[in-house]
Amino acid sequence: MTLPLTFSPEVAEARAAGAPLVALESTIITHGMPYPQNLDTARAVEAEVRAAGAVPATIAIMDGRMHIGLTGTELEVLAQADGVAKLSRADLAACLARGGVGATTVAATMICAALAGIHVFATGGIGGVHKGAEDTFDISADLRELAHTPVTVIAAGAKAILDLPKTLEVLETLGVPVIAHGQDAFPAFWSRDSGLPAPLRADSATEIARAHLMRSKLGLPGGQLVANPIPEDAEIPASTLAPLIVQAQSEADAKGVARKAVTPFLLNRLFELTDGATLASNIALVLNNARLGAAVARALTT
């Protein structure tokens, strides 16, 4: 049985030429923001990758196939679609088998990227250990995927709504390299400094690429997480966000929001509580990660 992979013309041409490729997720399009802002942002992120010298490969499941790179029409269809499944490792195969449509989370995007031979993936922030996980056991599949699938993930750290100390502990237990780019502190998505030190630091895309290649040579499974801090002019201080996150989490608990619905609920409430500031910061950090992702992809191909 052949893999149900469909490459966009742009990605197919890049693969044939050995050009640098950067995978992009699709959950940010379907679950991250409303239309048409989601479409505009997706186009802007792809343009940022191209401007930085690489080829973007936005990944989504459509008609039961893994689409590696989306055409302009496909991107627009996905941006306006309703009821799109949010796919991770557990439900990716089932969606493909039934010929469904789905947006890929960090974990699912990593799987598809690896199958397509793409080694770098730029996203906003990874999932992790949710607050209260000692009772709910709500831990994102993204963490184990980082330990399993050989893709370097460029993100602004883990989402600030999570339990960041526990997230870092789990990543350490799983043997995942956590590398802060250009600073010693582990960033917290909308904020440059979480108050926690990053285990590792790299100051250039070349260093990050070399670490990726060395892991492969050593036969070590999994990828690496590159924590790229949000640009200074776009950050929201952690001290400003902390009480709002507590409020949003309390509301989620009161409403019985659970499992995959938790993150979208919290992000939406924080958007409302900050009068849209979190969304503006989110867009800025994704664009920043796209630029670094392109630089790492270029370094891997030289």
Swiss-Prot record:
The entry's keywords: Glycosidase, Hydrolase, Lyase, Manganese, Metal-binding
Record-listed E.C. numbers: 4.2.1.70
GO biological process: nucleobase catabolic process
GO cellular component terms, A-Z: cytoplasm
Disulfide bonding pattern of the chain: none
Organism phylogeny: Bacteria, Pseudomonadati, Pseudomonadota, Alphaproteobacteria, Rhodobacterales
Annotated function: Catalyzes the reversible cleavage of pseudouridine 5'-phosphate (PsiMP) to ribose 5-phosphate and uracil. Functions biologically in the cleavage direction, as part of a pseudouridine degradation pathway.
The name this protein goes by in its record: Pseudouridine-5'-phosphate glycosidase
Family, as annotated: Belongs to the pseudouridine-5'-phosphate glycosidase family.
Record-linked InterPro entries: Indigdn_synthA-like (IPR022830), PsuG (IPR007342)
Binding locations of Mn(2+): 138
Cofactor: Mn(2+)
Tree of life domain: Bacteria
Assembly information from the UniProt record: Homotrimer.
Gene: psuG
Pfam families hit by this protein: Indigoidine_A
Active site as annotated: 25 (proton donor), 159 (nucleophile)
GO molecular function, one term: hydrolase activity, acting on glycosyl bonds
Reactions catalysed: D-ribose 5-phosphate + uracil = psi-UMP + H2O
Entry binding sites for substrate: 86, 106, 140-142
Record note on cofactor: Binds 1 Mn(2+) ion per subunit.
